[in-house]
Amino acid sequence: MAKIIAVANQKGGVGKTTTSVNLCAALSLMGKNVLLVDCDPQGNASSGMGVAKTQRPNTYDMLINGAAAAECVVHTDYGDVIPASKELAAASVELINAVEREFVLKKALMSLFSDYDYIFMVCPPSLELLTVNALVAADNVLIPMQCEYYALEGITDLLTSIKMCSKRLNRRLGIEGIVLTMYDSRANLTTQVANELRRYLGDKVYETVIPRSVRLSEAPSHGLPGVVYDRINRGSKAYMALAVEFIARSEK
């Protein structure tokens, strides 16, 4: 049975897509069966895995048009993908009147739970209905975040939302962990924020940190995860190390 992970942070530009793509690819390279479900209308995680944003059927078709999840899966050499496109932006509005609207994604994906070791759902940078659907479907939430001042405020809001979802909609929902991204060890603020997070959240913060990396930024333009595009750069090595730590935590 798959472990279901929502990758969420309501703040944009924190490395959510990069982390989703590279962690999925790293786990796949390690022999795990992984599915990435792109729930972000921007579709950047899809293209980062080499899947065109025009690919149909996709997440929108699965949620709104009744397409079977298995029909939406695209196979790649570094993990499976259910892609997203800009049409997904309308899904939150179209789901408003749906029966049990917060559970549509979970019901759609249930047929795939036994096919994978891990299923990652990439959430949009907001706490709207698509994100709520992912939180309801998930076992745990993985939170990528930058070490900057405003991130501390944002993480408090997100943890409150997760707690509320856990109380009302998904009692098993927990925090998988927090991944520090775009990490600059030379900056005093980075160290201060990291220390504050670890003081507040303890071992929920991963030991592995993800440094800034030009090669990771270049990889999506080639339709490849960074860990495939350039395996020896420090960003890729960090994501491979994160995958090892993720597996160790998951399989305790």
Located regions from the model:
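P-loop NTP-binding core
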Residues: 1-252
